[in-house]
């Protein structure tokens, strides 16, 4: 009991969200300022390229993934509070009427996606479509993690078990292959060089405008962008074709249109919200949740510190008092409510 009273949580990171990304560029590509090496041959990148080009395949994942299972690894109690069905977290910004951005435009129509029956419907449609395209099953899916991040390996394990239980029920559809990346320089060694097929990652807003939330997905023509999914590059290289190519380019156009709206903020927010909803509804990205604050032992009242929904203000310790005792969860909650 004494030890329990010495443990509380870090202050939540409200401007960050986690989501699942597909790699639409599984092959080597030379940008002017960066080289993507792509997926290793043992993970069958040709097979993957055909699969990820199928909206039915991606939507099977959209409805098969239960975010609660992954979040429960780090938040065994209260994980429902961290689930998201959008990429932008709530309370990020609001329009002139006080409507939260996540309730604007097309985002207002989104809710939790997890639905096993729907997932299997899309899987069955994908099997028929991909069999005709020459895809072999099970589809290998490299799913990497950073061993330096606490519990990421456990999250990968429960993710694999949960998703395969849904999508492999009655048919050997996928094989999620968990791989350990390096603990140092993980971004450059894995995500930025496209050495994955599916992975969970995050984005933190830089400023309080929805344009900041498009950076992991939007790319200008010929540009490497922020090296997340390589959506536009996949189209430019002819890997992403047909319906999916049309969806990708429509998203790019929606973002470009939203960026031009600078005088009517309500219209701007609605346009960006429509683009984000379009991205999610077509399973070009799959929401997961907000970061779960870790449990810590501290003598700081973290709620006295500076706060901003974006940027690094919450990392500053100016004005925070050092107490003569460790903060319990009861005191932590009282400090939060008193701010």
Label every PLM stretch briefly.
Residues 12-15, 60-104, 151, 155-161, ...:
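Detector for C-terminal structural segments
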Residues 9-15, 166-183, 230, 316-321:
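A generic structural motif
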Residues 3-7, 53-59, 66-68, 137-140, ...:
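Loop/turn elements at helix/coil->beta-strand transitions in domains of secreted/extracellular proteins
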